């Protein structure tokens, strides 16, 4: 099984999750390409992969701008190539997990849901079966927002994602790849 682990991380929270995903995939003996989206040109053909993990932090209820731009480019590329078809028929042996890290200071997980749904649409349009949507709490790291890590709706989220969160991610990865 060929696995792609594609992510954007501005503060390091999503990168922690992405690295744990990569480790767990490798422990299962699968090949994995882990790629950080940076906003620079990234040549990737998602259709070369049987299983894709795609993640981002949540910024104003959406994935990071570099990931949004990449997904727009990919959607356009696949439309032109005729890979996006009416009714989005499922591709055999094509699976995806979309995930995010979020602080949820104002409305909790509801702030993160639009970001994950947005990311999932690329894969759904390409006929991938979306196996799961993962939401991992992550602390606010910028000086301006750091206070939200203790005063937000989710309570004290300092230090998250922590080792317990990352162990949970690894267990989920191992469960997903046993398809």
Where are these regions (language model features)?
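Short active-site-proximal "capping" loops at secondary-structure junctions
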Residues: 39-41, 59-60
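Aromatic-flanked redox-active Cys/Sec active sites in thiol-based oxidoreductases
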Residues: 7-11
């Amino acid at each position: 099984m060929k696995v792609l682990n594609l992510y954007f991380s501005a503060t390091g929270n999503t990168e922690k999750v992405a690295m744990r995903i990569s480790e767990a995939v490798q422990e299962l003996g699968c090949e994995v390409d882990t790629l950080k989206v940076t906003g620079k040109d990234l040549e990737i053909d998602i259709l070369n992969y049987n299983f894709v993990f795609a993640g981002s932090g949540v910024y104003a209820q959406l994935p990071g701008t570099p990931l949004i731009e990449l997904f727009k480019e990919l959607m356009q590329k696949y439309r032109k190539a005729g890979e996006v078809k009416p009714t989005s028929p499922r591709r055999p042996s094509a699976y995806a997990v979309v995930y995010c890290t979020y602080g949820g200071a104002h409305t909790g997980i509801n702030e993160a849901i639009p970001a994950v749904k947005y990311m999932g649409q690329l894969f759904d349009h390409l006929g991938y079966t979306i196996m799961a949507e993962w939401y991992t709490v992550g602390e606010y790291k910028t000086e301006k927002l750091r206070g939200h890590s203790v005063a937000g709706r989710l309570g004290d989220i300092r230090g998250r994602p922590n080792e317990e969160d990352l162990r949970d991610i690894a267990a989920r990865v191992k469960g997903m790849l046993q398809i």
